[in-house]
């Protein structure tokens, strides 16, 4: 047992060190050669020798670095939660069609809604409308998957159903592209080619806040998810409210998938 714990510490320590090294490499290395001492001066808030270097570090490398870290944490956490609930190591947001659902929500906003979400009470536009559309699309597919999981006992069949949902949403997106305007299709295609550099320094606080909220919910679910590893009946005997856990998982996974997809 002690040997196993030491092994885990070594693995986690190695991964943590690797993350730190990659963060440093991302900040100090790039297509533009910026001296290391200049990068340190920029990060400490001092004036750099060239104004363009300050722009590159703060507007490109730093947001890109934080976005990559948070996206990795969000996708791994959502995948772990789905694998635990469905008792299947292959379950994740892409295979179950949740990412496709988020993309469909964005397509409805950008291609059918003109980039805005309007109700009788409020109107959302810009990247906040994209986030809401992605969240609603991801949650809708996740609700459908959870409903199917109560009917389908085979995990393999459930994964196949998730793949089918993904193809259906992709077909609907293609249909929306066919009837949309050229400007709408262009905007959606540019968004669909997203990269870690798509989050600007101004958008980074909102992206970080939403991701951290989803991760905090995932942390709150650690104990009930550990109980679910032993089976739903055992978890219920331990006092775990499975329906409530699934609802929180629904919100956390939907939020994390929506944020990583929409930005």
What residues fall within each predicted segment?
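Alpha-helical transmembrane segments in inner-membrane proteins
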Residues: 1-263
């Amino acid at each position: 047992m002690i040997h196993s714990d030491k092994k885990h510490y070594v693995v986690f320590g190695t991964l943590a060190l690797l993350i730190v090294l990659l963060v440093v490499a991302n900040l100090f290395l790039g297509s533009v050669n910026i001296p290391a001492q200049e990068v340190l001066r920029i990060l400490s808030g001092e004036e750099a020798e060239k104004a363009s270097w300050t722009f590159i570090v703060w507007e490109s490398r730093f947001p890109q670095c934080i976005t990559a870290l948070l996206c990795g944490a969000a996708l791994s956490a959502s995948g772990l939660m789905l694998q635990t609930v469905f008792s299947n190591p292959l379950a994740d947001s892409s295979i179950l069609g949740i990412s496709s659902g988020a993309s469909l929500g964005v397509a409805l906003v950008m291609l059918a809604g003109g980039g805005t979400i309007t109700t009788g009470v409020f109107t959302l536009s810009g990247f906040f409308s994209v986030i809401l559309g992605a969240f609603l699309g991801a949650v809708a597919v996740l609700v459908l998957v959870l409903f199917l999981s109560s009917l389908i006992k085979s995990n393999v069949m459930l994964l196949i159903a998730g793949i089918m949902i993904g193809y259906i949403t992709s077909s609907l997106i293609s249909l929306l592209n066919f009837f949309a305007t050229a400007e709408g299709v262009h905007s959606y295609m540019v968004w669909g080619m997203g990269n870690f550099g798509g989050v600007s320094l101004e958008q980074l606080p909102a992206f970080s806040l939403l991701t951290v909220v989803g991760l905090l919910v995932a942390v709150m679910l650690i104990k009930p998810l550990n109980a679910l590893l032993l089976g739903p009946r055992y978890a219920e005997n331990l006092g775990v409210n499975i329906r409530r856990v699934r609802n929180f998982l629904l919100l956390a996974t939907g939020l994390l998938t929506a944020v990583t997809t929409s930005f």
